[in-house]
């Protein structure tokens, strides 16, 4: 067993002395050969996760964005500003994920978990591809660049990115078990809380028959993020079993505070970018939903809830889960690919 301050060692790539017995496999501090054997996995949930993630494969350019070109020009000034800022936020954090996940994987010694992290990194790259396709379709090159880099000049955007980015950077400098857990919690916050006011904005556009292509892109991104949330929740739960001594009362308070901070930032962000001027949404709806998510995320890790009440999904926001529920997106079993989105006649091949 390790202590919070124990420094993790980067796993060797070739390790002829690595353990092959399943009972010796560990999330961290193990002695892996890095051999991927799909018939012998220590963690039973990995096989189901892997198949689900693989079945989720989608191609952004197959979603028809033709209606969005005109819709984007017809959005109100407030809706357009929200669209641009939310997209800038999503673009940056999905981009940094592709760099962060391999960094985490170097210190994970359960090879089947690294398979999952590799798939997640690939899906984050697809999300970046999706955002690029969305911008290329609806924007001029000048507008595109302005949206891409708004996070550098908008203090609200920058503060949000710094919270997650600094936690990721911390693990660059501190390879302790506690630092790894903090970066895992940061991922959990990112996938399970940080994106949701953005997602609900797009889904609200969909409810009002606006930007259907963008809504469908976001819906598929949301489905992927749900599997990523499942992955990091499971990683944290396995670490709770394997390294229970690290989950001291003090550290659990730290983790809960991180989740709380993520919630409060998401609520402030919703107040700033959505407020009370978007038809169909207001700041109270956003805040209630985020507090509900914060409690849900804590309870799923066995932590005490953060907010009094807020234990069930707000009735006024039930449409969010209807849009984001992966089970509502049809999958062709034989082709093992999604068939729920309309294919565009134009496929770009310039990546």
UniProtKB/Swiss-Prot annotation:
A single BP term in Gene Ontology: deoxyribonucleotide biosynthetic process
Active site: 131
Enzyme class: oxidoreductase
Family annotation (SUPFAM superfamilies): Ferritin-like (SSF47240)
InterPro entries: Ferritin-like_SF, RNR-like, RNR_small, RNR_small_AS, RNR_small_fam
Function: Provides the precursors necessary for DNA synthesis. Catalyzes the biosynthesis of deoxyribonucleotides from the corresponding ribonucleotides.
Record protein name field: Ribonucleoside-diphosphate reductase subunit beta
Lineage per the UniProt record: Bacteria, Pseudomonadati, Spirochaetota, Spirochaetia, Spirochaetales
């Amino acid at each position: 067993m390790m202590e919070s301050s124990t420094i993790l060692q980067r796993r060797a790539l070739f390790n002829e002395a690595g353990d092959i017995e399943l009972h010796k496999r560990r999330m961290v501090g193990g002695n892996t050969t890095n051999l991927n054997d799909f018939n012998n996995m220590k963690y039973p949930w990995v096989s189901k996760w892997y198949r689900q993630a693989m079945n989720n494969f989608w191609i952004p350019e197959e979603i028809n964005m033709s209606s969005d070109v005109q819709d984007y020009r017809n959005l109100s000034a407030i809706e357009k500003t929200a669209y641009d800022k939310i997209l800038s936020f999503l673009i940056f954090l999905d981009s940094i994920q592709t760099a962060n996940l391999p960094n985490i994987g170097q210190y994970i010694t359960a090879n089947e978990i690294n398979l999952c992290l590799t798939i997640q990194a690939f899906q984050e790259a697809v999300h970046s591809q999706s955002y690029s396709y969305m911008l290329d379709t609806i924007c001029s090159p000048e507008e595109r660049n302005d949206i891409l880099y708004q996070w550098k000049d908008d203090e609200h955007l920058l503060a949000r990115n710094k919270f997650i980015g600094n936690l990721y950077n911390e693990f660059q400098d501190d390879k302790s078990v506690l630092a790894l857990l903090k970066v895992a919690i940061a991922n959990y916050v990112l996938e399970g809380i940080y994106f949701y006011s953005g997602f609900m904005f797009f889904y609200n556009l969909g409810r009002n028959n606006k930007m259907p292509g963008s809504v469908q892109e976001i819906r598929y991104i949301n489905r992927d993020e749900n599997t990523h949330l499942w992955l990091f929740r499971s990683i944290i739960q396995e670490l709770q079993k394997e390294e229970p001594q690290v989950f001291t009362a003090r550290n659990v308070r730290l983790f809960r505070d991180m989740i709380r901070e993520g919630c409060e930032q998401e609520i402030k962000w919703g107040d700033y970018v959505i407020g009370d001027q978007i038809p169909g949404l207001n700041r109270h709806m956003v805040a209630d939903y985020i507090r509900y998510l914060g409690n849900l995320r804590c309870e799923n890790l066995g932590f005490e809830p953060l907010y009094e009440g807020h234990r069930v999904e707000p009735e006024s926001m039930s449409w969010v889960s209807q849009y984001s529920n992966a089970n509502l997106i049809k999958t062709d079993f034989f082709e093992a690919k999604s068939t729920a989105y309309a294919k565009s006649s134009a496929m770009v091949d310039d990546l």
